[in-house]
């Protein structure tokens, strides 16, 4: 694989070689796009080569997907659930290999890589149960001998465009639900994590083949903006789920809206943790460490802003600075590493540029603030003391950079939390019930995820995941998110011989 490095030998266990076709369309592997190399962010050396999909591959795949949709939507929901159960079992059988690949190709530490694959397995389990609970309402009719009810039917095809930071979890949030709801899936993985796209798809394809189902039910393509743009423009895809930057997400939304399609957007986050004067300081400090340093600050739910009550400011900061100095930076596959590399050399450059902007706006670096010299994309975990009014605080720097802000009252803290354009995740540390219920109430956090005494990141799959404002407003994963993947029809049935009209209208 890319080198004689023993580190890569396990890839053959999940169907990968030194040269891979990056397009699974019409039930077969083919690819006629450009040849790219996927790189190990720990050293920027090639892991393997991938041939990306072309627009011709895309069109062939969508035609087959259209035909497969006619078959898949007629399979009973519990049977579709059984297929998703088998996909979960297939992932379980390769959990460690897939987790290792994710760590190798994306750069997150091994525990997080395995945890991400486990999240997809959990989504499969959730979807299996859901397949017997796609319930519609039965509604009393005001007219005699009439019945009203809701029917939920598949949309047909769901497009899923995922990002590098969670190259398979976000697929799981969408695809597991879309499949049990009777939709085919067209997946475009991130261009910098093609191997995880291929490895995941191979397992899904094996399950479909074993059950004599069309492979086109799950169509996957490695590629860049050209393929993503095709998905956004395609009227055959009624729903497009996009995870990525606000800039690209806005373009996707405009393109899909122009054809009257629907979008699920999971864009940027600028998440805050509030530590009140009555908080458990140790619990808060441990939570902030994971929230700010985990995945090298490349989660959409990473804690970017730490709001400390003036009475506990010094104490919390002292604990955090001690913890930060003990963070092991290094190869994400090595035991004990807590901070792996940023995903690309460009990410490392953006970190360095961001630090200069922060300094120019009055930011005081308390620890970190430097890129680590060497061949990988490593940077130091960074804590910065800064004013809440600094313009840079309103932006998302996708790196382990934590802004520390001081406040005097609960109301001031909530105002700072809500002062940014994004509205994904938030958390407060307090023992006071009044603070808790004000925080989760209508005048509290304006985010889609509102936590108490836990980090901003690490969401469970049972709840709906998503945010408000510039984050996009979509909801994926658990709860009743499934309704976004189906078409709702209100049906009124007359089983009598008369024709009474609603609202008592007499017409002729």
Curated annotation (Swiss-Prot):
The record marks 165 as: Transition state stabilizer. It comes from the Eukaryota. Transmembrane segments: none annotated. NAD(+) binds at residues 244-249. The keyword Oxidoreductase applies. Its EC number is 1.2.1.3. The keyword Oxidoreductase applies. Coiled coil: none annotated. Induction: By abscisic acid (ABA) and dehydration in roots and plantlets, and by salt stress in plantlets. It is an enzyme of class 1 (oxidoreductase). Keywords: NAD, Oxidoreductase, Stress response. Pfam families: Aldedh. It catalyses: an aldehyde + NAD(+) + H2O = a carboxylate + NADH + 2 H(+). One of its GO terms (biological process) is response to abscisic acid. InterPro entries: Ald_DH/histidinol_DH, Ald_DH_C, Ald_DH_CS_GLU, Ald_DH_N, Aldehyde_DH_dom, ALDH7A1-like. One of its GO terms (molecular function) is aldehyde dehydrogenase (NAD+) activity. The active site is at residues 266, 300. Belongs to the aldehyde dehydrogenase family. PANTHER family: ALPHA-AMINOADIPIC SEMIALDEHYDE DEHYDROGENASE. Homotetramer. This is Aldehyde dehydrogenase family 7 member B4. It comes from Arabidopsis thaliana (Mouse-ear cress).
């Amino acid at each position: 694989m890319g080198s004689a490095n023993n580190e890569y030998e396990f890839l053959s266990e999940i169907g990968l070689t030194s040269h891979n076709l990056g397009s699974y369309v019409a039930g077969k592997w083919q690819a006629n796009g450009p040849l790219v190399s996927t790189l190990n962010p720990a050293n920027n050396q090639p892991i393997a080569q991938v041939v990306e999909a072309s627009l011709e591959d895309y069109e062939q795949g969508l035609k087959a997907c259209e035909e497969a949709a006619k078959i898949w939507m007629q399979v009973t929901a519990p049977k579709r659930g059984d297929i998703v159960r088998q996909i979960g079992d297939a992932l379980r059988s390769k959990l460690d290999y897939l987790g290792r690949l994710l760590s190798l190709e994306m750069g997150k530490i091994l525990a997080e890589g395995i945890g991400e694959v486990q999240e997809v397995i959990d989504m499969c389990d959730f979807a299996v149960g859901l397949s017997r609970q796609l319930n519609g309402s039965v509604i009393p009719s005001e007219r005699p001998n009439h019945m009203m009810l809701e029917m939920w039917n598949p949309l047909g095809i769901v497009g899923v465009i995922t990002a590098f930071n969670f190259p398979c979890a976000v697929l799981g949030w969408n695809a597991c639900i879309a499949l049990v709801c009777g939709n085919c899936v067209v997946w475009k993985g991130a261009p910098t994590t093609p191997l995880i796209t291929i490895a995941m798809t191979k397992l899904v394809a094996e399950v479909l083949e074993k059950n004599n189902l069309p492979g086109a039910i799950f169509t996957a393509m490695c590629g860049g903006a050209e393929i993503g743009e095709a998905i956004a423009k395609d009227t055959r895809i009624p729903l497009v789920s996009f995870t990525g930057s606000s800039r690209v997400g806005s373009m996707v939304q405009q393109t899909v809206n122009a054809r009257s399609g629907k979008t699920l957007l999971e864009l940027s986050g600028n998440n805050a943790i509030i530590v009140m004067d009555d908080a458990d300081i140790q619990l808060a400090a441990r939570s902030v460490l994971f929230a700010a340093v985990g995945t090298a600050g490349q989660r959409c739910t990473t804690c970017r802003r730490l709001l400390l009550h003036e009475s506990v400011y010094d104490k919390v900061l002292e604990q955090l600075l001690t913890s930060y100095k003990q963070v092991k930076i290094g190869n994400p596959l090595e035991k004990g590493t807590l901070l792996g590399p940023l995903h690309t050399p460009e990410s490392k450059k953006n970190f360095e540029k961001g630090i200069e902007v922060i300094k120019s706006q009055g930011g005081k670096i308390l620890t970190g603030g430097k890129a680590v010299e060497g061949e990988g994309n490593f940077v130091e975990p960074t804590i910065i003391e800064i004013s809440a009014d600094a313009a840079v605080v309103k932006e998302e720097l996708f790196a382990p950079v934590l802004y520390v802000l001081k406040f005097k009252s609960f109301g001031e803290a909530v105002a700072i939390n809500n002062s940014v354009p994004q509205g994904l995740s938030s958390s407060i540390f307090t023992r006071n019930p009044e603070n808790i219920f004000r925080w989760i109430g209508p005048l509290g956090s304006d985010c889609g995820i509102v936590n108490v005494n836990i980090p901003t990141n690490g969401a469970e799959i049972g709840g709906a995941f998503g945010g408000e404002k510039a984050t996009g407003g979509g909801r994926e994963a658990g709860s009743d998110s499934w309704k976004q993947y189906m078409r709702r029809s209100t049906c009124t049935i007359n089983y009598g011989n008369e024709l009474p009209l609603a609202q008592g209208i007499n017409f002729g």
